[in-house]
Amino acid sequence: METLIASLDDAPIIDKDGYEYLVHPISNGVPMLDPALLREVVVELMQTAELDVDKIVTPEAMGIHLSTALSLQTDIPLVVIRKRAYGLDGEVSLHQQTGYSESEMYINDVEAGDRVLVVDDLLSTGGTLAAICASLSDIGAEIADVVVVLRKVGPSALDDTEFEVTSLLDITVEDGEVLVH
C-alpha cells in the first residue's frame, strides 16, 4: 500500500463550496493514473475481497478501471451500473443521492441468486453504494462483499443498513491535507 499512501500525499485538495475535495487518480482519473498504483490497488483488492462470486458489480464511472483490472486478473465477469438507461429486458432503475449530486442509475445483467462483489473507488457520503446495495438486494442478488479503495471517515448512508463495507484505506481530509487512519 506504499504507492497508494504516497499518492495521497501528492493529491491536490480543492475547495468546493467549503467542502475539501480530494482529487486523486483512483477516484477522479486525474492526476494521471500510474500503472504501478493501479496494479498495487488491484493486488490488494484480490487479497481483501471475497472472490467466490458470479459477478463483479461497479458503478460508472470511477469504479470501472478498478473493476476491469480486477476482472481481467480473476476471470470474474464485470457488470457496470450505468448512468444511462438502455431499455434492455430486466433493466432495473435506482435513484442515488450523495452529498453533492442526485441521479438515476441502471442495473443490467444481475439476476436473483447471483452472488456479487461490489467494488468502488471511494466511499464518502455512502449514497451511491447504499442505493446500489439496496437495489441488488431487491433484485435478489446475494452481496458477498462490498469493497472500496478509499473510505472517508465519517457518517455514511450505509451506517443504518445491513451492508458492511471493507476499505483498503480509511482517510480524512483536514486543513488541506489527507490523513490516513
UniProtKB/Swiss-Prot annotation:
Descriptive protein name: HGPRTase-like protein 1
Keywords: Purine salvage, Transferase
Keyword Transferase belongs to the record: yes
EC identifiers of the protein: 2.4.2.-
Membrane-spanning segments: none
Biological process (GO), any one: purine ribonucleoside salvage
SUPFAM superfamilies from the UniProt entry: PRTase-like (SSF53271)
Species name: Halalkalicoccus jeotgali (strain DSM 18796 / CECT 7217 / JCM 14584 / KCTC 4019 / B3)
